[in-house]
Amino acid sequence: MLDITLLRDSPDEIVTMLHNRQQPEDEPKLRQLLEEDAERRKLVQESDELKSLRNRKSKEIAEIKKSGSGSADALILEMQSVGTAIAEMDSRLTALETSMEDILLALPNRLHPSVPVGRSAEENEVFGEPVSFTHPLDFSLKNHLELGKSLGILDFERGAKVSGAGFPVYVGKGARLERALINFMLDSHTEKHGYKEVFPPFMVNRESLRGTGQWPKFAGEVYHAPEDELYLIPTAEVPVTNLHRGELLETESLPISYAAYSACFRREAGSYGKETRGFLRVHQFNKVEMVKFTKPEDSYQALEDIRGHAEAILRALEIPYRVLLLCSGDISANAAKCYDIEVWSPAEEKYLEASSCSNFEDYQARRANIRFRRDGKSKPEFVHTLNGSGLATSRLMVSLMEHYQTPEGGILVPEVLKPYTGFSEITPSA
């Protein structure tokens, strides 16, 4: 959520941001918000003046009654009229504040100056040079789905029977390889980069979705259990960020860095064009998430750190990848700046998104009321929140399986995963 003071003082900047985000339809909402804000401020002043008058006159009425020096009936009638006016003003103020909050929750975050202006994903910028590793693939390649079926380690058909399309089943060494990836990533983030591991709930309440920005704008994309008013998480970002919702943190505790594994659930299984095969379009997938809470002045260095920590996983696995700096027309509504990390699929001959690393500045913290105090006398400030996928295993598994496949139809296990799997290869007879 944006600061109303920013909107009030710099409306033209916000209008430009909305157009750069390809959201010009939100400009009337901004105008409405500013009009309601002006009316609210005027009403607050008038209401305060009437309440002050009522207090003064109430004292006069009490003095008249105490002294018995005359009748207070006229003043009492006047104050009844004032009370009615105050009640009407307070009712209007409540309506204005509700409307303003709805608009504030719907408006997207401001953009960092380094975010390139562009209309769509086609205008995202490649950040740095793509990273490549040599894998001997001079034979007829199978895609991840063909490998999974032939090796008996993935079962999409039975997953569909149990739950519907988009719910994969990992079998045998495929399940072990998936678990190895998760444990390797968690160990890397906690042991090498200082993250504290948390294992969060996979269901959250509406206040948590509101705090991280999925509610109300993206409410239709999450699975909902209406009888309990709980929602399956689309990402561990939601429960982990909300661990500190409503808290006032001490400056000595910052930065706070968490790493969390969770299953992720999304009703809309991504927008991947016509590609719907295998892991490229799923409703449930596994992901290790990195979440940070920082002081405002430290957040952009923290973003680079998160990106580097995600890249370190791919380098250790020797998976080819590239980094994109998302343009204004493709970045999520909540983020001020975002990097996407894409892994290369040799069978599909294209890059696949496996990680997003974002700085939300104080956008989420303002919604979730997460603040810190620099010292005992200073005014509380909002922290900056960040997160990054470290990484999503579904797309990562696609690239891993395809790059490490053998001419015989097996899959070699990356060196760093062997201590976790207990085997070095998945063979056709596995």
Curated annotation (Swiss-Prot):
Annotated signal peptide: none
Gene3D superfamilies to which the protein is assigned, alphabetical: Bira Bifunctional Protein, Domain 2 (3.30.930.10), Serine-tRNA synthetase, tRNA binding domain (1.10.287.40)
Pfam families for this protein: Seryl_tRNA_N, tRNA-synt_2b
Pathway annotation: Aminoacyl-tRNA biosynthesis; selenocysteinyl-tRNA(Sec) biosynthesis; L-seryl-tRNA(Sec) from L-serine and tRNA(Sec): step 1/1
Residue positions binding ATP: R266, R267, E268, V282, E353, A354, S355, S356
EC number: 6.1.1.11
Reactions catalysed, as given in the entry: tRNA(Ser) + L-serine + ATP = L-seryl-tRNA(Ser) + AMP + diphosphate + H(+); tRNA(Sec) + L-serine + ATP = L-seryl-tRNA(Sec) + AMP + diphosphate + H(+)
Subcellular location: Cytoplasm
PROSITE patterns xref list: AA_TRNA_LIGASE_II (PS50862)
One Gene Ontology molecular-function label: serine-tRNA ligase activity
Main location group: cytoplasm
Keyword vocabulary terms for this entry: Aminoacyl-tRNA synthetase, ATP-binding, Cytoplasm, Ligase, Nucleotide-binding, Protein biosynthesis
GO CC term (a single one): cytoplasm
InterPro entries in UniProt: aa-tRNA-synt_IIb, aa-tRNA-synth_II, aa-tRNA-synth_II/BPL/LPL, Ser-tRNA-ligase_type_1, Ser-tRNA-synth_1_N, SerRS_1_N_sf, SerRS_core, tRNA-bd_arm
Any one Gene Ontology BP term: seryl-tRNA aminoacylation
Binding site for L-serine: T235, A236, E237, E289, S389
Domain remarks: Consists of two distinct domains, a catalytic core and a N-terminal extension that is involved in tRNA binding.
Record note on quaternary structure: Homodimer. The tRNA molecule binds across the dimer.
Function in brief: Catalyzes the attachment of serine to tRNA(Ser). Is also able to aminoacylate tRNA(Sec) with serine, to form the misacylated tRNA L-seryl-tRNA(Sec), which will be further converted into selenocysteinyl-tRNA(Sec).
Annotated family: Belongs to the class-II aminoacyl-tRNA synthetase family. Type-1 seryl-tRNA synthetase subfamily.
Name the UniProt record assigns to this protein: Serine--tRNA ligase
Originating organism: Chlorobium phaeovibrioides (strain DSM 265 / 1930)
Lineage summary: Bacteria, Pseudomonadati, Chlorobiota, Chlorobiia, Chlorobiales
